[in-house]
Structures are given as structure tokens and as C-alpha cells.
């Protein structure tokens, strides 16, 4: 199939492009953002930049929407309305943010659109009205078993941990003041100062490229995941694939993603601290639990399963539009 989309979340785009469908992207904006600019002139073989004129002459089979403004972009460039005369999926990456659990989704009651959620928790908490929904759990390329746990430190991987303070559980780091924490990610350099004086042992470890990040994470003995109100983070899945034991706040989708034997999982911070201390003190036990984490992540979040689920979703979207048109 020919799928029109925008490169909104790079990691998610990469997973989709691992499949066999053709993905179409409008050219970059004047600012240089968008299109296939992120690939630096070497995009995957099934990714193409196409003009609006080409899309009008040869419309895509499905448009994959991730932002509301893309609905108007389709009307503007293709002269077609998603969900009416163009099969459409709205990929909802996020948890609802207001009036939970009664939050109305922006495309609720649009029977011609299929909403795809990334977790069952999100599907449960968004009110989508008459709009059909399905869940496609993440698919993550296996970075390989790399865990060494050489450094008795915690890895904490969060983008914008200060701006997203309570959402990402950054405020909870103060409870882990007895442990050395290495923070990775966009704007994570702001975190050490933000948590002082309650935590003096948080260090910025870099905003690294994926392969460098995997190696750096795998050297830390435990992965710490404190997200309070987010969809399931890709970095947690990647940590598990690396073979890291994980200490996880039991919120949103964590109980489905993380077996208790994969490290520690609790909504009780005191329990989580005790378990984290034990994992740091016993590298062999950490390695054993990390292998459990890896098996669980590979089984649930494999790329082949992810791509198969998306094939079904694209076909369903086309059928939905035919039924309502």
C-alpha cells in the first residue's frame, strides 16, 4: 500500500519503514523541517518525498495522521478530506491530559477514521465516541543483549525531564537520593540542577545517538523508569531488550509491559527503593532478572508482530471509508 504520513516521532517512523509498504512524505518546510530531512539524503528504500501535485494525481491508499493540523494539510494539498474521501488513521501516541477519564478525543465521533492507540491503557481512558479504535503495541528493533551492569548506577532516559516534571516522574528522583543516577535525553542537562538540593547525585550523561545510548545504558546496573502519566516509553522497552533489570513505577501500561520478575515494579516508592538497592548490590541477580526482561520485551514488542498489526489496520481503514462514504 501507499501510505502518506509525516515524520513526527522518529523512532516510530523508523519502525514503520521496516515494513514493505511504501511511505510518502511531503517535501520539507522552508525551515528545513519535515519531509525526509532526518535521514540526511539516505532514506530507506520504501520512503519517498512527493509533491502535492503528485498526491492529487495519484492519491495514497491511506493517510496516517498524528496531529490535528494534518487533517487540514490533506484538504489543502490533496483536496480530499481524511475519513470521507481518503481512508485515514489517526495514530494517538499520548495519554489524555485533561478531564480524565472523560476526555473526548479530538476526532471522536468520526466514523470514517480509525484511531490507533499505542497502549490498551490509552484506549481505555480516551473517549472516542463512535470512532472505531484498535491498539497496536510498540514494535522495537532489537538492539541485542548488551548488558554488563559494570557501573553501579541507575540509567534514567527521559526527554525534557524538567518541562515534563510530574508527567515523567522527575519529581520522584528526590526519593532516590542515595543512588547515583545518570540522566540521558533531550534537555536532560537541566535535570541535575532542578533536583538539587534534594538529590545531589544526578549527572547528565548525554543526548546520544541510538547505538551510543544503548551501549551507555547497558553499562549501568539498573534502568529507572518513573513515568507517572505517559504512554509506554520506547526507552523502557529498549532497556529490557538490552537485558537490563528495570525498576519501574507501576503506572499506566507498566503492569502489562514489565513482569514483576524483570526487576522491580511497584506504585509504592518505598518498595521500589528497597528493590533498587538490592539490584544494585547483587549484579548476578540483576543479570538474571535482566534476561527475564529481555525475553518479555522480545515476545511482546517484536517488529514482525507490529508490522502485521499495521497491515491489518491499513486494510481496516480502507474498508471503514468505503462503508461510510
Locate the predicted segments by residue.
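N-terminal pre-catalytic "stem/leader" segment of glycosyltransferase-like enzymes
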Residues: 1-76, 265, 303, 308, ...
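Catalytic core of nucleotide-activated saccharide and alditol-phosphate transferases
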Residues: 69, 73-163
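Conserved catalytic-core segment of nucleotide-activated headgroup transferases in glycan assembly
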Residues: 140-197, 204
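Short alpha-helical segment that forms part of, or immediately flanks, the ligand-binding pocket
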Residues: 214, 237-241, 252-256
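Aromatic "clamp/platform" in nucleotide-sugar-dependent glycosyltransferases that forms part
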Residues: 228
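Short hydrophobic beta-strand element within catalytic cores of glycosyltransferases
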Residues: 245-248
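Conserved acidic donor-binding segment of nucleotide-sugar-dependent glycosyltransferases
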Residues: 260-270, 278-284
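A charged, aromatic-enriched C-terminal amphipathic alpha-helix characteristic of glycosyltransferases
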Residues: 281-315, 319
Amino acid at each position: 500500500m501507499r501510505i502518506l504520513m509525516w515524520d513526527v516521532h522518529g523512532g516510530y517512523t523508523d519502525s514503520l519503514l521496516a515494513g514493505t509498504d511504501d511511505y510518502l512524505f511531503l517535501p520539507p518546510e522552508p525551515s528545513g523541517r519535515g519531509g525526509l530531512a532526518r535521514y540526511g539524503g539516505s532514506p530507506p528504500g520504501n520512503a519517498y518525498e512527493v509533491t502535492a501535485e503528485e498526491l492529487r494525481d495519484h492519491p495514497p491508499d491511506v493517510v496516517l495522521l498524528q496531529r490535528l493540523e494534518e487533517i487540514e494539510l490533506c484538504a489543502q494539498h490533496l483536496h480530499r478530506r481524511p475519513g470521507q474521501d481518503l481512508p485515514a488513521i489517526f495514530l494517538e501516541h499520548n495519554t489524555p491530559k485533561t478531564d480524565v477519564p472523560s476526555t473526548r478525543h479530538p476526532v471522536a465521533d468520526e466514523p470514517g477514521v480509525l484511531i490507533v492507540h499505542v497502549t490498551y491503557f490509552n484506549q481505555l481512558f480516551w473517549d472516542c465516541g463512535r470512532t472505531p479504535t484498535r491498539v497496536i503495541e510498540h514494535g522495537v528493533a532489537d538492539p541485542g543483549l548488551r548488558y554488563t551492569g559494570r557501573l553501579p548506577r541507575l540509567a534514567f532516559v527521559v526527554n525534557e525531564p524538567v518541562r515534563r516534571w510530574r508527567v515523567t516522574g522527575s519529581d520522584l528522583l528526590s526519593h532516590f537520593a542515595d543512588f547515583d543516577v545518570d540522566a540521558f535525553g533531550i534537555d536532560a542537562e537541566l535535570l541535575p540542577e532542578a533536583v538539587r538540593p534534594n538529590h545531589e547525585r544526578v549527572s547528565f550523561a548525554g543526548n546520544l545517538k541510538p547505538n551510543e545510548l544503548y551501549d551507555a545504558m547497558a553499562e549501568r546496573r539498573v534502568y529507572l523508569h518513573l513515568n507517572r502519566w505517559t504512554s509506554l516509553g520506547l526507552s523502557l522497552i529498549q532497556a529490557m531488550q538490552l537485558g537490563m533489570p528495570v525498576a519501574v513505577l507501576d503506572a499506566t501500561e507498566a503492569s502489562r509491559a514489565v513482569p514483576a520478575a524483570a526487576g522491580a515494579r511497584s506504585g509504592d516508592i518505598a518498595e521500589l527503593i528497597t528493590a533498587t538497592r538490592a539490584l544494585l548490590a547483587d549484579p548476578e541477580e540483576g543479570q538474571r532478572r535482566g534476561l527475564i526482561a529481555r525475553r518479555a520485551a522480545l515476545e511482546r514488542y517484536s517488529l514482525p508482530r507490529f508490522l502485521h498489526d499495521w497491515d491489518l489496520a491499513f486494510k481496516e481503514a480502507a474498508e471503514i471509508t468505503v462503508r461510510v462514504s
